[in-house]
Regions:
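Extended glycan-interaction surfaces of carbohydrate-active proteins
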Residues: 1-14, 38-58, 109-146, 185-284
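Acidic/polar, glycine-enriched structural segments that form the non-catalytic walls/loops
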Residues: 1-12, 87-88, 98-106, 166-168, ...
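Aromatic-rich carbohydrate-recognition surfaces in CAZymes
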Residues: 14-20, 24-129, 148-152, 156, ...
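Amphipathic, soluble alpha-helical interaction motifs
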Residues: 26, 76-79, 107, 161, ...
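Solenoid-repeat scaffolds in large eukaryotic assemblies
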Residues: 37, 176, 183, 234, ...
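Short amphipathic alpha-helical coiled-coil/interface segments
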Residues: 97-100, 179-194, 305
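Active-site neighborhood of glycoside hydrolase catalytic domains
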Residues: 150-189
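Extended, well-ordered alpha-helical segments in internal regulatory regions
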Residues: 161-167, 221, 225-228, 288-297
């Protein structure tokens, strides 16, 4: 067919929606392959809309049903704005951004629930719902569930980005006000829910349980264009990430000080599955770290990065 995709890994991995969206800007926009970006994003957008509207999953794109796919789609579109400006971004992708935001607000994304405090929650007890997707016998090794830190950082970012797309349109003034009000609620709830007394962010919060594992998902929360944290709060989180997760190869998937740390991906398939997200570094997360560093330190951070 005429579709274009990015494979997660050849030949053993398929096309997976969240991974494809995370990789898309770097694989296309960063090397001036605009047409490839638009072709791949067009396929993804159509697949996502079809899934939300009818429940039909794309034949080739796997994990279109993972709840954060919609959030990563908006993030990937936001990167298009970085390269080609807000006007072109709004013209080409404004409709799908609004579609996704409204679908989330109206509870139309399966296993993605908006709560009275504005935060999003999901059920990851029985199957993985984030990139920490290792399983044994089909069950997630890291059962992140409830309020997940990067979900809600991406949600706040999505709301503020939608505001930026539509704030110049007088006909959308009421809609923009609604999104701004919701974003403010999300911001307050995010800080109350995730920012702990140690100065970093809980990885996920499920009822009375708050996961203290120091993981790189907090780097996503402080590296987004719109973060719910102020500069001082971001600096404290950044210090934790720098001290416990930063390596020359990327960010560790778990701090050496956290329970279960295992930096070596060796052994039989079960041993490797247990280890894969318990310490080994991920290069792609360094992009969020670099963005966060520049947001805190400005151009003075260039020599460090």
């Amino acid at each position: 067919d005429d579709e274009m995709h990015i494979m997660v890994g050849y030949p053993w991995f398929a096309v997976r929606a969240p991974d494809e969206l995370i990789a898309l800007p770097g694989c296309t926009l960063a090397i001036k392959h605009r047409e490839d970006y638009e072709a791949i994003m067009g396929t993804l957008v159509n697949a996502l809309k079809e899934y939300v509207e009818t429940g039909t999953k794309h034949a080739t794109i796997k994990e279109i049903d993972i709840p954060d796919t919609s959030l990563w789609a908006i993030w990937a579109i936001q990167q298009y704005k970085r390269f080609y400006g807000i006007g072109e971004c709004r013209e080409r992708y404004g409709e799908i951004v609004k579609f996704i935001v409204d679908a989330i607000r109206n509870g139309r994304i399966p296993n993605l629930y908006i709560n009275e405090n504005g935060l999003l929650s999901t059920n990851g007890q029985n199957s993985p719902v984030t990139w920490l997707s290792a399983t044994i016998d089909g069950r997630p090794i890291i059962p992140r569930t409830g309020y997940i830190v990067e979900y809600n950082a991406l949600w706040y970012n999505a709301l503020k980005f939608a505001v930026a797309l539509y704030e110049s349109d007088e006909m959308m003034a009421g809609y923009v006000d609604d999104l701004n009000n919701l974003a403010e609620t999300v911001k307050e709830s995010f800080i109350e829910t995730f920012l702990n007394d140690y100065g970093y962010l809980y990885d996920y919060v499920n009822g009375a349980y708050a996961d203290l594992s120091v993981r790189p998902n907090m780097a996503i929360a402080i590296g987004l264009d719109y973060s719910p944290l102020d500069r001082r709060q971001r600096k404290r989180v950044l210090d934790f990430v720098t001290r416990e997760l930063l390596t020359p190869k990327g960010l560790r998937s778990l701090s050496p000080k956290s329970y279960g740390y295992n930096p070596t991906y060796v052994g039989n398939p079960i041993e490797r599955e247990y280890a894969v997200h318990q310490g080994p570094a991920r290069p792609w997360l360094f992009g969020f770290y670099a963005d966060a560093y520049f947001k805190v330190f400005g151009v003075s951070g260039l020599s460090f990065i």
